[in-house]
Regions:
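Phosphate-binding loop that captures ATP/GTP phosphates
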Residues: 49-75
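A conserved SF2-helicase RecA2
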Residues: 191-199
Length: 199
């Protein structure tokens, strides 16, 4: 499945929370393919999510927090940070590590797919991710909401950027994270599951 939202709404932070929660429950690694933000920012969010610390608190006792983080996650979160992640590299890394979960932040930017139109490229990417999930483990991707999702609390499948059907058709579940522009709600997020074939 995938999580989508407008830029700077909290997709990476949300996935960081999910990954750190799951990491302590498995003996197999969680592979996080990051082609969106600086890898160090993702790593800091993972530490903050796991330990419940602000940035100043995290950096006040770096060595102790590193130890606590590794104990809590069992060292199971492996971050692959590259602006150009190719499908062949992903397949090789998955076979090598046999992960319990794979995260693509952002799945739309995975390279190695060709088609005549962008929506067909995205369809192939999401179909490929679905096949990986069948063969190996659950896959979670992130992508953007289009401009119609700006200021919308409850995002639906129609707000997914660059595709009205191709991405949505391949997902077992879709979670939209909305954010209102109303005063006093800047820090509030609104979660809407617009597709769920798991139940």
């Amino acid at each position: 499945g995938f999580v989508f939202a407008r830029p700077e709404t909290g997709k990476t932070t949300f996935l960081s929370h999910i990954a750190t929660f799951m990491a302590g429950q498995t003996d197999r690694p969680i592979l996080w393919f990051n082609n969106e933000e600086q890898g160090e920012k993702v790593r800091v969010r993972s530490y903050q999510s796991t330990l419940g610390l602000t940035t100043p608190q995290l950096f006040k006792h770096v060595d102790d927090n590193e130890r606590r983080y590794l104990e809590a996650t069992k060292g199971n979160i492996l971050l692959y940070d590259d602006a150009s992640i190719y499908r062949g590299d992903v397949e090789t890394i998955i076979k090598e590590h046999q992960p319990s979960l794979v995260i693509f932040d952002q799945i739309d930017k995975i390279r190695g797919f060709d088609a005549d139109r962008p929506d067909l490229v995205f369809g192939r990417i999401y179909q490929w991710a679905r096949e990986l999930a069948k063969l190996h483990c659950p896959i979670i991707g992130t992508c953007q909401s289009d401009g119609t999702g700006e200021g919308v609390k409850w995002l639906t499948m129609s707000h997914v950027a660059e595709a009205k059907t191709s991405k949505q058709a391949e997902a077992d579940w879709i979670l939209g994270i909305g954010k209102s522009n109303e005063g006093g709600t800047e820090d509030v997020r609104f979660f809407n599951i617009s597709k769920n074939k798991l139940m």
